[in-house]
Amino acid sequence: EKTMKTVGVVIPIYNVEKYLRECLDSVVNQTYKNLQVVLVNDGSTDENSLNIAKEYTLKDERFILFDKENGGLSSARNVGIEFFSKEYDFKNITQELKENSLVEFKLDNEDNPYNIYKIYKSSNFFKNKDELLNFKAPDIDYIIFLDSDDYWELNCIEECVPRMDGVEVVWFDYNKIYEKDCLEKKDEWTWFNCYNMGIKKDIIISDEWLDKYCNIQTFAFVWSGMIAFNYLSNQKIKFLDYIFHQDVYFGFMVFFKSNKIFLLNKKIINYRIRSNATTLRQSKIDKQIILPKYLDFLSKFYNKNEDAKKYYSLFSWSKMVEKAIEDSFYDEKNIITNYFLPSLCMQLFQKDINKNLDPLNIGIYINFSKVIFKMFRLKHQNIIFNTNLYGTAKQRIQNQLCYKLGQTMIINSKSIIGILFMPIYLLSTFLNYKQDQKIYYQKIKKDPTLKLPPLENYPDYQEALKYKEHLSYKLGKILLESFKTWHKGGLFRFP
């Protein structure tokens, strides 16, 4: 019997007293029980968010609660990742175990960059004082994020876990829950549908997702899926701290670096669209009426919170551009440079900023983004033109002589007549290829611009290299090699 997989759940909390119970009840009552739940109170200033979190932590031994300074969604989620990565050492504040009480810890690490004040855990979790003194983070197999104003269907985890076998990500769909006084126009649009409309299979590879990304040019992902924790740790994927739109960078990295993604076409999370949202389909932090505490300094420069948020949104895109440039140095396939960086720059391309109202000096990134975006737009236009004119790298490889010869051999080896007449079919393929080559050289003599560019210049070059692993290509290559050495008996060595 398979060991039951452990799922780590990370829930950031900020001023959500109205919604938090519904969220946490959906976790407590999951049909799949083997959960380890991290609540991160991100400096809530309302009356009850922290108290509700403490109440659930006391009741459920699977919960642990971190209380920290306000730093935004990214910092809160990163606390969860770092806890499960066993990066934290704990020091007891509580020395003696009392039944049905909260045990308090503080961090024993030298650094405490997120300014974690205290950590709480139910005393009922600990069998004895020795366990209390040696408390460590649990091992988990998978990780999932949940925002504290959203809630799961009760079978959410049970649907995901069996489908995690052999993939890095299970990606599922979501319901939209509109608040009564919400002004946003209702629609059925979701990221899942946007990317997966018409796909019949359950599992896709990262390249298939990337093909869609190239057309759509934007993507976001955090809470609509489950992720293999070893994969997340090994790839060192975390959230960018102190920015809006955290799901953009995180989502791209999770999907781009993955191998296989399971498409779970079920709506098993309820995504709440709140009435005080200032911008649509942006990070949940934009839905707060007041500025988060860590953005207080912007009120010195901007009279309206809305203007401050717009400025900070531009700063967030600028930080992503900066990080993408840094990460591109380690990306051998140049996917970040060719696809992700231009899409980030697109967000800043038409933006201008008042130099006197730029406390974070993002003007330089906006100007840089304009240059990059213009450059890539020109390159993209050339790629489209070249593809229309020159075809694709895949087509080029399929039109090579070795591929055509191998294909001829495979097709005609299925019948006795085909095998008997194989030499004639191969000769015919060879002569047709030579005729095509002759016509091609005549064309480029008249018009040199029709000369095919090097294969490496095609946007699908890396993917096209897989075609050289096809049996057709390999058979044809062996046949051509044997013809080259026929005078040494090469033909008789042909397998």
Report residues per predicted region.
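Generic detector of ordered secondary-structure context
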Residues: 72, 219, 224, 263, ...
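C-terminal subregions of glycosyltransferases and related glycan-biosynthesis enzymes
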Residues: 272-400, 404-411, 415, 452-458, ...
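Short linear elements at protein peripheries
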Residues: 398, 424-469, 489-495
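Generic recognition of stable, solvent-exposed alpha-helical segments in well-folded globular domains
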Residues: 15, 22, 155, 312-316, ...
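Sparse recognition of residues in long alpha-helices and their boundaries
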Residues: 96-97, 270, 337, 421-422, ...
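Alpha-helical membrane-targeting segments
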Residues: 406-435, 476-495
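Generic detector of short, well-ordered, non-transmembrane alpha-helical segments enriched
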Residues: 91-92, 228, 250, 267, ...
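Nucleotide-sugar donor-binding/catalytic module of glycosyltransferases
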Residues: 1-295
